[in-house]
Amino acid sequence: MLEEEYTLDYFRSEGFERKVCKSCGAAFWTRDPEQEFCGDAPCVTYNFIGNPVFKPHNVSEMREAFLSFFERHGHTRLERYPVAARWRDDIYLTIASIADFQPFVTSGVVPPPANPLTISQPCIRLNDLDSVGRSGRHLTLFEMMAHHAFNTPEEQIYWKDQTVALCDEFIKSIGGDPARVSYKEHPWYGGGNAGASVEVLIGGLEVATLVFMNLGRQKTDQPPVDVNGVPYYPMRLNIVDTGYGLERLVWASKGSPTIYDAVFPEMVSRLMRSARLEDLLDNPEFTKIMGLSARFAGVMDISGTNLYNLRRKVAEAIDVPVERLERIVVPIEKVYSIADHTRCLAYMLGDCIVPSNVREGYLARLVLRRTLRMMNDLSMDDALTDLIEAQMQVVGAENFEQDVDAVREIVENEEARYASTLERGARIVQKIARNYRAKSSRVPLEEVITLYDSHGIPPEMVKEVAAAEGAVVEIPDNFYSLIAETHSEAQKEARGEDPLDAYRERAVSLPPTKKLYYELPNEVEFEAMVLDYFDGMAVLDQTLFYPEGGGQPSDTGTLVTSESMVRVEEVVKLGEVILHRVTGGPLMRGDRVKGMVDEERRWSLMRHHTATHVLLHAAQQVLGVHVHQAGAQKGSEVSRLDIRHYRHITPDELRRIELEANRLVMADTPVYIHVEERTKAEQKYGFGLYQGGVPPGREIRTVQVGADVQACAGTHVRTTGEIGPIRVLGVEHIQDGVERLVFAAGIAAVHAVQHLGDLLQESADMVSVQPENLPATVARFFSEWKEQKKEIERLQKKVVDLEMQNLDGEVVDGVRVVVRTLDATHKELVALATTVADEGGVALFASSDGTVKVVATSGAPTVNAVDIVREVCGILGGKGGGKPNLAQGAGPDASRLEEALEYGRNRIIEALHGE
């Protein structure tokens, strides 16, 4: 990026010089004329360890110092956003403070919530997960303290000079010496934007980055700027995007050996006691080694590195044998990681992320299980639930949406799942390891990743179990980082060929369709003009027909002209133009038409859509605030609502959800629909608005049903009373962490109840009792059936015993061989054949009731029952399989049964003779 981007009046007036680092070659600005290095690791080592560069601050003190400083300088303080980025459809977790305002504020679609503003935003980045605890500086969750200004041609807030001046002044306000600060030039790009930036360095540590975002990928009439080989174009907005690392500032203010000692002093001490490592804290050698190790490890890149080689370099640098270094630091690294991970989990679960196998839930489970593994390695006394609760209390439990008790239940549920995974995982890995060992090949990394993604089996367990089976597995030191990186961004669903694509160009040339279904949602008749007609698609100037969208099917109905009538089968939206797929005859441009919407279907869809909102609210009331919509599909007869929940919904909870929903219906609460500016709606209602996805645009349409408010484009009833009864027909566990509620509303619910009543009456009639007596009668019948089943089994055993007395067979080389056709059930065939094999013999039995069933058993090592059954069934036109001692099969050709059994007998005799 051009030098003039960084040649600031402030740098000139304050006596800065621009230099080039002798180590990395990057340009930087400094007040020190003798400085030769940029001041960033690895060009220099950390020199603040044991030598703090700021006045001592804990986390709360440093956060308040920053926010109040910028408030004094005209910035509005904002409350933090959730760590679950529910206002974004491209990422799952909040990764930076600027992510709070992407994409709509940064693109200029909506105004910022304040301008200028300051915020301390908890962020989660898992791309360096394996470095946490090892490097002394990496965290999964960190607070990015920031001040942002959004400059437009009409309103200039401030730009580069004032941003750097504010940075200098803030550093001075917390006891730092601005003369020790270097500003390193570093062009920034990401998320489709770019700009000049400077890294703020002091004591060898980067404590902040000041980004001046003024470029975007969107092509404009301005000449492009090359950033890392990619053309970017000047934006209308010039955005000050700063990020100050709260934890790094605290670390530099304390000069502790690691960032973990500075940020989590009480938690680290607690974990050391829990792991029975507290004696190390009083060991001078330990303190020395940890301090030196942190100082030197800090200048090395942990990610993707061979960890042993890195430790060897650190050991050489501090003159300690590498084995001794590992014995000391590995348990402590796990303590540090647990301290970090439990705080990360406190935010994840406290902000209502539900652990699962998908989306942000996958990432929460990844961190949670990694924490459990390390706690198991250290045989810790503390429970994970207690540690996460302690971290929530440090932050302030009132700052989380989810309550502590629910978080504890979620964690306990996950611990039980993890234990179950470990129990069954060993068997799965053993089978795979034996397979690769037999092929004399290593277990590939792809297999290890699949085992983790599909079964939740940790790589450490894979390596351990595989080694016991004689198979080799190599796990990269950054395994968890690789896994997290592949799951951190939302994957765009693969889209097949859209049949509407052929019409896009034509639709763009047409005026927007007036949406009468919003203005007059309860009307079913309207008049309009045909603007275009092609391929059975009619475009009107206005319409009452609702197009498919948001999980709601389209309206259907008719269009009538003076000469003809056509049927509207489907309605779709293409941009701002609505297309009606019609059958029954062509329409002409300019035709006046009368549209008639199928009233019963329209009302049923409206009832079901509003009922979806009601049911979601009821589920949150019963199950907890963590419940979020994972999907929905409305129908005119039956609808479904998928919700995120950490365990199966019980029958009692299902009844309570249904009752809660119907109470809201009976309250006959008005349904309020408004079009609101996005920023104001988010501030008023929170990000629970986006249950059904994130709509584009400056304004969003909000639908309020009781206490539930969502951004929604669907059609709705006027009051909850118009929904009519809501009947939950069932619940399905469709995937880990997602439950599906199947329901009906209005007349459809009445039909569903009537159908269930009919089934009940039919069942009662079948046993000649009144419906109210059916449960007791069924219980009695079931009890009698169980007794009769026992008696049948007793008699069957007696039959088998009697049959056995008549199955003499023949003896071949001392082995009893019985080959016979029997009039017996399949179960009886197996029982008889097994009895022969248990006595060391060989049996081949068949029965025929149209299809021939074949069973073979072998108690002789030279006779393989599978081979016999496959060949016999092959003659019968079928196939079979099983194990060497018991095999089963079938074939349709009963006419060749005698031939097949004779062939089988001969094969058995040959095997016994060793032929």
Curated annotation (Swiss-Prot):
Belongs to the class-II aminoacyl-tRNA synthetase family. GO terms for cellular component: cytoplasm. GO terms for biological process: alanyl-tRNA aminoacylation. It catalyses: tRNA(Ala) + L-alanine + ATP = L-alanyl-tRNA(Ala) + AMP + diphosphate. Binds 1 zinc ion per subunit. Its cofactor is Zn(2+). Zn(2+) binds at H609, H613, C712, H716. Consists of three domains; the N-terminal catalytic domain, the editing domain and the C-terminal C-Ala domain. The editing domain removes incorrectly charged amino acids, while the C-Ala domain, along with tRNA(Ala), serves as a bridge to cooperatively bring together the editing and aminoacylation centers thus stimulating deacylation of misacylated tRNAs. The keyword Ligase applies. The lineage of its organism: Archaea, Methanobacteriati, Methanobacteriota, Stenosarchaea group, Methanomicrobia. It is found in: Cytoplasm. Catalyzes the attachment of alanine to tRNA(Ala) in a two-step reaction: alanine is first activated by ATP to form Ala-AMP and then transferred to the acceptor end of tRNA(Ala). Also edits incorrectly charged Ser-tRNA(Ala) and Gly-tRNA(Ala) via its editing domain. It is an enzyme of class 6 (ligase). Its main location: cytoplasm. This is Alanine--tRNA ligase. Keywords: Aminoacyl-tRNA synthetase, ATP-binding, Cytoplasm, Ligase, Metal-binding, Nucleotide-binding, Protein biosynthesis, RNA-binding, tRNA-binding, Zinc. Pfam families: DHHA1 (PF02272), tRNA-synt_2c (PF01411), tRNA_SAD (PF07973). Its EC number is 6.1.1.7.
